[in-house]
């Protein structure tokens, strides 16, 4: 296997940057910065590079690859200010976003760095994403990447500050949303000596094989009227596919999807986007009205999908096309193949239709997911979710100084840690449009809200209260960390 050291040119304006979430699995829209200028959206887009170890578990493999990162030091209080590490997740990392972490960095006079996840964006070790080249793509290797980079950056910072070798480290705090939120929690679990604490926002720490709770939450968040309208729409879609297949798919600009279940996965994800990212009325108001008026539900739903999911939130049909997902050439859309590999090997999160009262087609079942995994990566691929939960602890991980936050309407909260303890406080942010990463992104979570402002949350006081608790925990843990550092000198 040849290692590709040169970076791959990918020009993508990614929505949440450090916290991008992809469809099918964590469902992150690829363009949520609608009508927001690039300069206001980012704290920095200046690319920096780090030579990362390919295989941290092999003493004999010394291969390296170039890993992209960013730094923002405008608020840093030299020489002993804290360092905030923003973990980039399962997508290209185009810079450091101007969200609520920017507000926290300013408050705590922190420097900020952000590391792109291996294989994603411009941090691809190989020029081919064939299955055999993906064996180094795992959460475990990603955690080692973070540890190695953290050590490298601290040493570089010490040199800049003229601190002698062996001098004390700055206090570090880790941040992440969704999968990167899980990485933030897992990093504190596995490398407690390298961080003073972690914020795990909407952190999916529990790997799940059959994730039926996901759809149950969507139905709950939708409310009875909207749920019934969604269920009727699904039945009409399934019937329409049998009698006028291409005509139905053309309403959604999705005629390229030859496999009907792939199309039904797209239409299910489109509904999820409304609740997960704080825009429930964009879907429910027109759909419920259409049902009451006797209007065509499929046409109404397709209008929502085209006008909002595709035009504003960046939903792309080809990322549901398994022919496209089998493409091993590194492209701007490679993240979808890469995330499916992680789902198919260690994390699962298979969003299957519940047996009763489902808001998605029953064709989206376990067999569908397993067949897709085999179609993309070969017959030997299987999600080892039990091993993942044994290794990290699932939602019962035994760690300290981790803040867990979840939006009340976010279906992914059922894969997070929702019970609170003294060492690992957990907060549910309750409001009508509080979804994925509301504590960092504000409301709605898409399109982008500068500095994650809570003004447009249906109950902003709930968001602000949780944020105040976050500040108090970070302040306490950084203080304890500084005291520990001073006592060790």
From Swiss-Prot:
Glycosylated residues (UniProt): 35, 51, 162, 253, 293, 365, 406, 419, 456
UniProt-listed Enzyme Commission number(s): 3.4.-.-
Effect of inactivating the gene: No visible phenotype.
Signal peptide region: 1-25
Residue runs in coiled coils: none
UniProt xrefs under SUPFAM superfamilies: alpha/beta-Hydrolases
Superkingdom, natural source: Eukaryota
GO MF terms, alphabetically ordered: serine-type exopeptidase activity
Residues at the active site: 178, 410, 436
GN (gene name): EDA2
Source organism per UniProt: Arabidopsis thaliana (Mouse-ear cress)
The keyword Protease is annotated on this UniProt entry: yes
Protein name as it appears in the record: Probable serine protease EDA2
Keyword terms: Glycoprotein, Hydrolase, Protease, Secreted, Serine protease, Signal
Function, in words: May be involved in a proteolytic pathway controlling the nuclear division phase of megagametogenesis.
Similarity section: Belongs to the peptidase S28 family.
Gene Ontology cellular component list: extracellular region
UniProt GO BP: megagametogenesis; proteolysis
Localisation per UniProt entry: Secreted
